[in-house]
Amino acid sequence: MAARRALGGLILLRNIMPVNQIEITSCGKRLLVPCAEIEGRTVIVTGRCVKIASIRDAIVAEGELVKNPGTFVPALKRSGLKADVLAFFQRPPDVTPKFKHHFEWDNYAAVDCANFDAWWEKLPQEARKNTRRSAKRGVTVKVVSFDDALAREIHQLCDESPMRQGKPFWHYGKDFETVKREHSTYLERSEFIGAYFENRLIGFIKVVYVDRIAFIFHILAFNAHYDKRPLNALITETVKICSQRGVKYLVYDKYVYGNKKESTLVEFKRRNGFEQIDFPAYYIPLTWKGKIFVALRLYRGAVGLLPAPVLKLGLKLRDRFYRARRKPAETKEV
C-alpha cells in the first residue's frame, strides 16, 4: 500500500511540468515571476492576493493568444503554476467574441491606416495646423536606426523632467545602459521615427509591428520644444508609414481607462485622429477565489470600479501631492 502511494506520488509529479521564473517589467520596474510553457505560449503569474495567469508580452505575441480554452485551461492547471484566474483577449480586427466564457469589452485608441488621405481630412483643423506649423518651424521627421547614438539622445530626452502627465516619469534618472536596454526590445519588428530640430533629436516614436497592427511603445518629446509641435508631426509621419506598409491599425494604448473618461491624454488622442476600438477581454476563474474575483469584477481595478467624480477628485489630490513634493526639490536646486 505504501509502495502504491509512493508510485502514485511519482506519477502525479511527472504530470506536473516544472515551474520556472522569468523577468518582466512592470511600471518601469524589473520583477521575477513564475512562468511555464503552455501550448506554445509563455504564461506568467502576477498578483499577490489573487494570482492572475496571462500570456507574457501578450500585446506583441503574434496570432491568437489562446486558440482553445478547453485545452489551454487544463494544461494550465497541470503546469504547476498557482493561478486563480486566466486573463487573455482577442486582438482586433477580429472582435466578435469566440468563446463562451466571461468577458468584458476592453478598448484601444487606434487610427485606421487604410487610407492616409481620409484620416488626414478627418483631423480637426487645429491638428493639421500643428503638423504644418512643425515643418515651418524647422522640424524634420524621418525613420532612424536604433544605435548607441540614438540611445544617448533618448537618454537625454528621458532626463529632461522627473514628471510627465502629472506623475513621476518611469525612465527619469536611469543610467544609459538601462535606457538603451529598455528601448531596444523587439528590434526585429520595430521602427523608430525621430523628430529633429537643427540636427538634434527633440522627439521620437517607437512602434512594434504585430500581425497587421502597429503598437506605439514609446512616444516622447522635449517639453522645451513644445512650441514646434513635434508630437503632431511624429504621429502624422507614423500614420503615413503604417498606411504605406499595409498596416490596419496604429494603436496608442487605451482610448479610455475604466471610468476615467476625460483627461489631457484622451483629448490629445482624439485631436490626432485616434478612435475607440472595443475588443473582448476574457477572465476565466480557476479557483474559488478566482470565481469571487471575477463575479465582483475586481479585475477592473480602482479606475474601473470607482465612480468618475471620485476618480476626478483623487487625480486632483494626486496632482497636488506631486506638486508639493516638487517645490522643496526646486527650492534646493535654486
Mark where each language-model region is:
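Active-site/acyl-donor-binding loops of N-acyltransferases
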Residues: P18-K51, I55, F99-A118, K248-V334
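Amphipathic, soluble alpha/beta structural segments
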Residues: H155-S184, G246-V247, G258, E262-R271, ...
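Acyl-donor-binding surface of acyltransferase catalytic domains
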Residues: L12, L65-D147
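Aromatic (often tryptophan-rich) hydrophobic motifs at membrane interfaces
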Residues: P74, T185-V294
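A conserved beta-strand-loop-helix scaffold within acyl/acetyltransferase catalytic domains
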Residues: L13-A53, D94-T96, W120-Y226
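N-terminal accessory interaction module
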Residues: L31-F89
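N-terminal amphipathic/hydrophobic targeting modules at extreme N-termini
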Residues: A2-A3, L7-G9
